[in-house]
């Protein structure tokens, strides 16, 4: 009898020692997953008609970037899951007062919540951290993730725009009959409230340098028209309404564009003889084309709207093109001559009298004789009459050799002076015959100079018409440029996000305005 008794006692002692070799967590895990027969493929419900309540919350750690060309929002978040699994309950006193158990996520049932509007084809969470299981059956999972979600970009008011991006979560594995999605609930002063916003921890949040978060609401969307077994029946969407910080684009794009566009007004100050009027205008046009090309690389290739900066550049390019045409017309007017064009009286009155007065242009001084010139002209008549008498009294030989005789000391002429003609008519006829070639030559010179003066005056009139057109276009183009620029950019300045996240809903969806249940 002693042998069997000793054997049984030894076996009992070995069993006790084996149980003592396991720690409390290992014993608890064996109890939950082996002894109770836990199956992670089955939903944690007692009846198949029941649904599992899954609560979600989103904590934003960093808004990494928003790529407009790809229409992709990249965020660093922590997505918080919470549900109850009655199969994972235990009595903490029986297992060394263990109230929380940390398990790998592949050991328990998961609701398989995925990001529907992802933009990289990765639906699952890349890093699977441990799941916290509490002794009363509550399961808590907080995995980190970097999501690349699609965000339709509205480029209408770029760079004074704001965007409404969202992260839409749902379960692609279970329908609305099997799980019920809801927002996480917190408690304050014994009152509970749903967390209807994206959580941001000020200490752990990194602010984005380009975008400012204006609203961050969260909402459970249920489509009553969709059947219960449809994946589109329910979802939880976290919205990010963000506003662009335009300082970078103002300094690097807008200010250079505006300055270059306004340089085209200097074309009207350049004289036409410089030959650089069209060159300056075309240079401005090329610079605007380069800026338009740079901006097109920053925005998505969409035909839904034209960005604000694109509107300004197109407006400027059209205006500069018109300035180039005006420069060609001004140069054509400036280099006109009386031999090719006739300056009509109507054009003279409009461009040489009316418009210069309205545009406050200084008129050139009239080419009239000065008072001194008039005195000299009147006194010259006496010299001419004395010269005529002198020529009448002197013979031709005396006139020809008068200087030579004085040079050789001959004070007396060898020939007798010619006497004046007997009659005045004969004298006048002789004088007329002698002076006619000189008078004809003088008349030819005077007529030629008069024609040349008229030619130059009319050419100067064409130049003045060109200057008047330049000044008129300066007074027209400058206000058009200023008003057009102000009208275009004021649209963006007054383009502000709505005061509330959802139109028609007065609730602000922020932590300061909790809705207690």
Swiss-Prot record:
Residues 1-21 form the signal peptide. Glycans are attached at residues 97, 164. PROSITE patterns: NEUROTR_ION_CHANNEL. InterPro entries: Neur_chan_lig-bd, Neur_chan_lig-bd_sf, Neur_channel, Neuro-gated_channel_TM_sf, Neuro_actylchol_rec, Neurotrans-gated_channel_TM, Neurotransmitter_ion_chnl_CS, Nicotinic_acetylcholine_rcpt. CDD domains: LGIC_ECD_nAChR_D (cd19028), LGIC_TM_nAChR (cd19064). It is a multi-pass membrane protein. GO terms for cellular component: acetylcholine-gated channel complex; neuromuscular junction; neuron projection; plasma membrane; postsynaptic membrane; postsynaptic specialization membrane; synapse. Changing residue 80 to K: In CMS3B; reduced adult and fetal AChR expression and a reduced probability of both adult and fetal AChR being in the open state. It is found in: Postsynaptic cell membrane; Cell membrane. It catalyses: K(+)(in) = K(+)(out); Na(+)(in) = Na(+)(out). One of its GO terms (biological process) is chemical synaptic transmission. It comes from the Eukaryota. Residues 22-245 are extracellular. SUPFAM superfamilies: Neurotransmitter-gated ion-channel transmembrane pore (SSF90112), Nicotinic receptor ligand binding domain-like (SSF63712). After binding acetylcholine, the AChR responds by an extensive change in conformation that affects all subunits and leads to opening of an ion-conducting channel across the plasma membrane. It is linked to Multiple pterygium syndrome, lethal type: Multiple pterygia are found infrequently in children with arthrogryposis and in fetuses with fetal akinesia syndrome. In lethal multiple pterygium syndrome there is intrauterine growth retardation, multiple pterygia, and flexion contractures causing severe arthrogryposis and fetal akinesia. Subcutaneous edema can be severe, causing fetal hydrops with cystic hygroma and lung hypoplasia. Oligohydramnios and facial anomalies are frequent. Myasthenic syndrome, congenital, 3A, slow-channel: A form of congenital myasthenic syndrome, a group of disorders characterized by failure of neuromuscular transmission, including pre-synaptic, synaptic, and post-synaptic disorders that are not of autoimmune origin. Clinical features are easy fatigability and muscle weakness affecting the axial and limb muscles (with hypotonia in early-onset forms), the ocular muscles (leading to ptosis and ophthalmoplegia), and the facial and bulbar musculature (affecting sucking and swallowing, and leading to dysphonia). This is Acetylcholine receptor subunit delta. It comes from Homo sapiens. The gene is CHRND.
